[in-house]
């Protein structure tokens, strides 16, 4: 099978992680990273060149090259959405990057430019749009609909029959119970539980843990003597 040449748009932490997963997928031949010139921090990453986006069309024709957009969740994923739309308008294909260990049924519907990491579990009868990042250990349950340009941090859990719109962020180990509707641009913080529908631009944050007055040695001494 002839491998498809591919570039990663981005040179930050998420782009580095995507690169590591992409290298596991045999159908791709990785060429290098590409970003706007003002964001180029170094000439090479992991030994691969970082190209100036200005020369994309000239150097890398769309018939021969694909591009995966790997930009973070800043500005409620709008930065990544803007770049995604720009590259799609130029006619490039943006394939999904899915870790081979991800548990994904064959019958789910998935758009393009989705990053699905290792040990993600997606149940049957799920629809996922475009340009979403689903990090390791996340669970997307049956009959869930996910829109576009969302970010699911590691350990996120979405229960069945839930509908998530666009440009949402879900923090570490956040959970959504079943039959919930989540509007556009919602922010759900780490360890938060969503049990009611969320309107557009809602923010849900779990109270932080309290720092104990005892230090670790005093606390463990108490525990040992208590039992």
Regions found by a protein language model. Name each.
Residues 39-103:
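Phosphate-bearing ligand-interacting subdomains
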Residues 204-227:
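Short, basic/aromatic-enriched C-terminal tail that caps enzymatic domains
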Residues 14, 72-75, 210:
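Short glycine-rich anion-binding loops that position phosphate/pyrophosphate groups of nucleotides
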Residues 96-212:
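Structural signal for interior beta-strand "rungs" in well-ordered beta-sheet cores
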Residues 4, 65, 184:
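Nucleotide donor/acceptor-binding cores
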Residues 1-61:
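Hydrophobic, well-ordered beta-alpha structural blocks that scaffold small-molecule cofactor pockets
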Residues 19-21, 46, 80-83, 128, ...:
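Short amphipathic alpha-helical segments
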Residues 16, 20, 78, 148, ...:
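Alpha-helical elements of the RecA-like P-loop NTPase motor core of helicases
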């Amino acid at each position: 099978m002839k491998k498809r040449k591919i570039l990663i748009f981005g040179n930050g932490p998420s782009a580095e992680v995507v690169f590591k997963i992409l290298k596991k997928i045999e159908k791709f031949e990785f060429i290098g990273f590409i970003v706007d010139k003002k964001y180029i921090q170094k000439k090479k990453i992991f030994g691969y060149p970082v190209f100036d986006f200005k020369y994309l069309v000239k150097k890398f024709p769309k018939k021969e090259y694909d591009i995966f957009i790997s930009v973070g969740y800043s500005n409620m994923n709008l930065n990544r959405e803007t770049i995604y739309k720009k590259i799609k308008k130029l006619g490039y294909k943006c394939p999904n990057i899915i870790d081979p260990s991800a548990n994904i049924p064959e019958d789910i519907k998935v758009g393009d430019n989705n990053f699905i990491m290792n040990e993600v579990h997606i149940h049957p009868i799920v629809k996922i749009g475009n340009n979403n990042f689903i990090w390791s250990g996340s669970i997307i349950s049956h009959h869930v609909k996910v829109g576009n340009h969302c970010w699911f941090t590691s350990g996120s859990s979405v229960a069945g029959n839930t509908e998530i719109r666009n440009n949402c962020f879900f923090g570490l180990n956040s959970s959504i119970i079943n039959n919930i509707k989540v509007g556009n641009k919602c922010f759900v913080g780490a360890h938060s539980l969503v049990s009611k529908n969320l309107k557009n631009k809602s923010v849900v944050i779990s109270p932080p843990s309290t720092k104990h007055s005892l230090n670790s040695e005093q606390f463990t001494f108490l525990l040992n003597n208590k039992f």
